[in-house]
């Protein structure tokens, strides 16, 4: 027993010491070929970094305004808007994390310990993972809300807490796996070229997870659209012409929103997914495209800038509130003004707009399912 226990202790100590060994960064970057690339093109990286940092600043400010809009507008203190707020928070952190990543890149990379390097890259994985999981949480909430509006209404505060908590817990675990041991510090031949301290198996695992998330989001939004179309056909069958035509308009608006959501998501993330798959399959120093990974990553980060536009600014009332925040106009009675400007007849609130952009759901239970998501609007039944 004695002789076998000594090597185990030594192995543990050496692995811990590796996390504070500055030479490991240089060794891994030299093995993958990124050491020479970064030395040869240091000036161009600085120029592109400035552009990328400006993009990140825009993303940060954009999402701060979204959070302020939700916080200062009482009518947005509902579960669905909390999901949008969580998405804005994760997108904001993605912008902050990528800015820090850029500032700590280049020559600064070789002054980092492996532990600091894992924190630099892990923070990006956590923020981007939280953003993607937030998109999935919004899709789940919209789908469940539609089903509950057909069956029965109940409190969804627990579901709100559960989904948001799961979003961050899973993201933290996913981003923390390399620093917890799933890395290639002691296995150079298994190292990623894009991220030289990450194991290729970890890269493949993350790519698989994100691909499954994308498929889940696609399936959920297709199911939402299918439910709306089913409702529209049912109204047509009952010869309820006014409701059927209104439902048909909402279905078309919903279809456009679904196409926008999925197209933007795929356009931003698919190139990075493909690059990471190439990283897993290519042998070291054989795929030159892997040395241009920053352009693929910034495209994924751009999704954090498009999310506020898709999920909030297409909502008419959120757009108005957003403009009020930007113009620094304090409207204490702004939340209740909309209620008194519309006549209330027989317990029903009528919107002045004939479009589906209003986020006030009609009291008619038959119309509720279609108002869940139309033209970017999101409403909760809570």
Curated annotation (Swiss-Prot):
Upregulating conditions: By the tumor promoter phorbol 12-myristate 13-acetate (PMA) in the presence of cycloheximide.
Biased amino acid composition, Basic and acidic residues: 351-366
Ranges facing Extracellular side: 1-46, 105-116, 183-196, 279-289
Name of the gene encoding the protein in the UniProt record: S1PR1
Name the record gives this protein: Sphingosine 1-phosphate receptor 1
Membrane topology: Multi-pass membrane protein
Residues modified to N6-acetyllysine: 10
One cellular-component annotation, GO: presynapse
Variant or mutagenesis effect after changing residue 269 to F/L: Impairs sphingosine 1-phosphate binding and signaling
Disulfide bonds: 184-191, 282-287
Annotated tissue distribution: Endothelial cells, and to a lesser extent, in vascular smooth muscle cells, fibroblasts, melanocytes, and cells of epithelioid origin.
Biased composition (Polar residues): 371-382
A single BP term in Gene Ontology: adenylate cyclase-activating G protein-coupled receptor signaling pathway
Similarity comment: family membership: Belongs to the G-protein coupled receptor 1 family.
Membrane topology, Cytoplasmic segments: 69-82, 139-160, 225-257, 311-382
InterPro entries on file: EDG1, GPCR_Rhodpsn, GPCR_Rhodpsn_7TM, S1P_rcpt
Glycosylation sites: 30, 36
Residues carrying lipid (S-palmitoyl cysteine): 328
Effect of residue 265 to L: Impairs sphingosine 1-phosphate binding and signaling
Compartmental location: Cell membrane; Endosome; Membrane raft
Protein role: G-protein coupled receptor for the bioactive lysosphingolipid sphingosine 1-phosphate (S1P) that seems to be coupled to the G(i) subclass of heteromeric G proteins. Signaling leads to the activation of RAC1, SRC, PTK2/FAK1 and MAP kinases. Plays an important role in cell migration, probably via its role in the reorganization of the actin cytoskeleton and the formation of lamellipodia in response to stimuli that increase the activity of the sphingosine kinase SPHK1. Required for normal chemotaxis toward sphingosine 1-phosphate.
The keyword Zinc-finger is assigned to this record: no
One GO MF term attached to the UniProt entry: sphingosine-1-phosphate receptor activity
Modification after translation, per record: S1P-induced endothelial cell migration requires the PKB/AKT1-mediated phosphorylation of the third intracellular loop at the Thr-236 residue. Palmitoylated by ZDHHC5. Palmitoylation is required for targeting to plasma membrane, enabling G(i) coupling.
Segments for region (Disordered): 350-382
Keyword set, alphabetical order: Acetylation, Angiogenesis, Cell membrane, Chemotaxis, Disulfide bond, Endosome, G-protein coupled receptor, Glycoprotein, Lipoprotein, Membrane, Palmitate, Phosphoprotein, Receptor, Transducer, Transmembrane, Transmembrane helix
């Amino acid at each position: 027993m004695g002789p076998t226990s000594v090597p185990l202790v030594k192995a543990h100590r050496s692995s811990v010491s590796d996390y504070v060994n500055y030479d490991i960064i240089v060794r891994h970057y030299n093995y993958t070929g990124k050491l020479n690339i970064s030395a040869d093109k240091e000036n161009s990286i600085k120029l592109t970094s400035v552009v990328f940092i400006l993009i990140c600043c825009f993303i940060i400010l954009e999402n701060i305004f979204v959070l302020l809009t939700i916080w200062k507008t009482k009518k947005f203190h509902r579960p669905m808007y909390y999901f949008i707020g969580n998405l804005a928070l994760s997108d904001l952190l993605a912008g902050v994390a990528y800015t820090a990543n850029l500032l700590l890149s280049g020559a600064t990379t070789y002054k980092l310990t492996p532990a600091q390097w894992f924190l630099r890259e892990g923070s990006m994985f956590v923020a981007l993972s939280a953003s993607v999981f937030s998109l999935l949480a919004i899709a789940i909430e919209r789908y469940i809300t539609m089903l509950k509006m057909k069956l029965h209404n109940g409190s969804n505060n627990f579901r709100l807490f559960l989904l948001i908590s799961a979003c961050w817990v899973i993201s933290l675990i996913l981003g923390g796996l390399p620093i917890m041991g799933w890395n290639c510090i002691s296995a150079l031949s298994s190292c990623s070229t894009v991220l030289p301290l990450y194991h290729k198996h970890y890269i493949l695992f993350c790519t698989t997870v994100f691909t499954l998330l994308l498929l889940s989001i696609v399936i959920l939004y297709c199911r939402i659209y299918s439910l709306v179309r089913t409702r529209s056909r049912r109204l047509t069958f009952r010869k309820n012409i006014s409701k059927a035509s209104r439902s048909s308009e909402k279905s078309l608006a919903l279809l456009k929103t679904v196409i926008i959501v999925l197209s933007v998501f795929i356009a931003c993330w698919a190139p990075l997914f493909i690059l990471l798959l190439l990283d897993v399959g290519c042998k070291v120093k054989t795929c030159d495209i892997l040395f241009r990974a920053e352009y693929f990553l910034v495209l994924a980060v751009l999704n954090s800038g498009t999310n506020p536009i898709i999920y909030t600014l297409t909502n008419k009332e959120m757009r108005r509130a957003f403009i009020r925040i930007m113009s620094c106009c304090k409207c204490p009675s702004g939340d209740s003004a909309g209620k008194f400007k519309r006549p209330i007849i027989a317990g029903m609130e009528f919107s002045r707009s004939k479009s589906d952009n209003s986020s006030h759901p009609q009291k008619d239970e038959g119309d509720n399912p279609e108002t869940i998501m139309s033209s970017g609007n999101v409403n909760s039944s809570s």
